[in-house]
């Protein structure tokens, strides 16, 4: 991972771009009691078109916000409830340009991080849940 140092504010960050195109940033805070994780995608409320494998698709207005809520659905139940049951405070938002999912917790950080990364990378949609 590339290390960046921000001397002016006494911070350091580690950054790496993964093979799938995602950029991972880590800000170590060993003196903090609470952990915080944030996952964002460059798809927000203003986005009504996307390209996948060279094919452009139009989507209805509001689909980013709709997906923000639907992404918490999992095969096993609901990731929002799973995170809360682990003592985390989860939330999500859709801005004009991005959709973000995050949580903060004082315990079970790694387990909560696995839940977050799982539901954003393995969406679970059924016809019943979409109707």
Give names to the regions the model predicted.
Residues 58-60, 69-131:
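Active-site-adjacent, His/Asp/Glu-enriched structural segments that form or flank metal-binding
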Residues 1-79:
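His/Glu-rich zincin catalytic helix
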């Amino acid at each position: 991972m590339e290390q960046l140092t921000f001397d002016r504010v006494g911070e350091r960050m580690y950054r790496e771009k993964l093979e799938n195109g995602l950029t991972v940033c880590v800000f170590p805070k060993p003196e903090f009691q609470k952990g915080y994780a944030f996952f964002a995608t460059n798809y927000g409320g203003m986005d009504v078109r996307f390209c996948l494998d060279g094919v452009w698709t139009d989507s209805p207005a509001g689909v980013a916000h709709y997906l923000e809520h639907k992404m918490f659905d999992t095969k096993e139940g609901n990731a929002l409830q799973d995170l809360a049951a682990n003592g985390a405070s989860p939330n999500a938002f859709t801005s004009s340009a991005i959709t973000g999912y995050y949580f903060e917790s004082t315990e079970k950080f790694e387990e909560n991080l696995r839940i977050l990364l799982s539901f954003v990378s393995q969406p679970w949609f059924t016809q019943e849940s979409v109707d």
